[in-house]
Swiss-Prot record:
One of the GO BP terms on file: urea catabolic process
Summary of the function given for this chain in its UniProt record: Facilitates the functional incorporation of the urease nickel metallocenter. This process requires GTP hydrolysis, probably effectuated by UreG.
GO cellular component entries: cytoplasm
Family in the record: Belongs to the SIMIBI class G3E GTPase family. UreG subfamily.
Name under which the protein is recorded: Urease accessory protein UreG
Organism: Hahella chejuensis (strain KCTC 2396)
Pfam families: cobW
InterPro entries per the UniProt record, alphabetical: CobW/HypB/UreG_nucleotide-bd, P-loop_NTPase, UreG
Superkingdom of this protein's organism: Bacteria
Subunit note: Homodimer. UreD, UreF and UreG form a complex that acts as a GTP-hydrolysis-dependent molecular chaperone, activating the urease apoprotein by helping to assemble the nickel containing metallocenter of UreC. The UreE protein probably delivers the nickel.
Gene transcribed to yield this protein: ureG
Binding, GTP: 12-19
A GO term for molecular function: nickel cation binding
Length: 204
């Protein structure tokens, strides 16, 4: 068991597949690690309810934060609601190894406060077009791991994975990125390996 709780921030635009990724990560990791989730929604707890319905974790391990107004503020300038939620989860479940913090749907300029996130994953999806990686922004260029999700939609929307691969390399330099598809599980084990290795997680 880790001595300190690893906080992983998961950001990305609305509809990119953040909640589906969180659900899959929980299902894969819950037997090996003591984990919990904080979700951010503007006016509802819809993402938290999705995770509960899909039995990602037990309900007492999931807290939905209603950010109101601008969701970026809750993960950056004023992370107090999220930090309070993490404190609540830590009190409920002593010895937490991992907390996944899912941001509300954001734009390419949103970033996590360093006090809220030790590792940041940024999720974009192929259906938004193959130009997204080269648009840049902190999510694309500075996140610890960029996840290019919904690869199965590439032929439908006419997006080139080769172009996205090239542009992601150009924009990110040496920083890693992974192509994924949560329906088939493509890329999931690579994402898990990244979290465990970079977060130095040790199974109990």
């Amino acid at each position: 068991m880790s001595t300190q709780t690893l906080r992983v921030g998961i950001g990305g635009p609305v509809g990119s597949g953040k909640t589906a990724l969180v659900a899959r990560l929980c299902q894969e990791l819950r037997e090996r690690f003591n984990i919990a989730v904080v979700t951010n929604d503007i006016y509802t707890e819809e993402d938290a309810q999705f995770l509960i319905r899909h039995q990602a974790l037990t309900e007492d391990r999931i807290i939905g934060v209603e950010t109101g107004g601008c969701p970026h503020t809750a993960i950056r300038e004023d992370a107090s609601m999220n930090l309070a939620a993490i404190d609540t989860l830590t009190a409920r479940h002593p010895g937490l190894d991992l907390v996944l913090v899912e941001s509300g749907g954001d734009n390419l300029s949103a970033t996590f406060s360093p006090e809220l996130s030790d590792l940041t994953l940024y999720v974009i999806d192929v259906s938004a077009g193959d130009k997204i990686p080269r648009k840049g922004g902190p999510g694309i260029t500075k996140s610890d791991l960029l996840i290019i999700n919904k690869t199965d939609l590439a032929p439908i929307v006419g997006a080139s994975l080769e172009v996205m691969d090239r542009d992601a390399r150009k924009m990110r330099g040496d920083k890693p990125f992974i192509f994924s598809n949560m329906k088939t599980g493509e890329g999931l084990q690579d994402i898990i390996r990244f979290i465990i290795d970079q977060g130095m997680l040790q199974a109990a």
